[in-house]
Amino acid sequence: MNKNIFIQNKIKNYKKKIDMPGDKSISIRWALLASQAIGISRAYNLPNSDDINSALNAVRKIGIKVIKKKNYCEIIGNGLNGFLFKNNTIINAGNSGTLSRLLPGLLAKSKNSIILKGDKSLSKRDFSRIIKPLNLFG
């Protein structure tokens, strides 16, 4: 299996305003993607939910600056794999299935490990769908 990813046309600069729907799942994905950008990503009117707050806290725990204001949120990314966290950092995903399934893939190339925890409901879910492929990548 080839484990290399080749990006032919790398985006050098992207400055646009995107109107996102007030969707919890999209907001979590935005937070994770913004953590990988270089510089400031800003989202206005993020929905207020426990799952989104768990995602923002997770991004903070991996060493990315998050500034939450009344009507917007900024994430100041460090670029691809620009994580600054200690080995065995504990991240609480709360009840967010989206976060708990996407974050491990995002952090798979990190030299440090995380301990991903969640509430009772999340802890009962089957994660073999993500564990098996991640193990194949090493």
Language-model segments: residues:
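Structural preference for solvent-exposed beta-strand-turn elements
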Residues: M1-G138
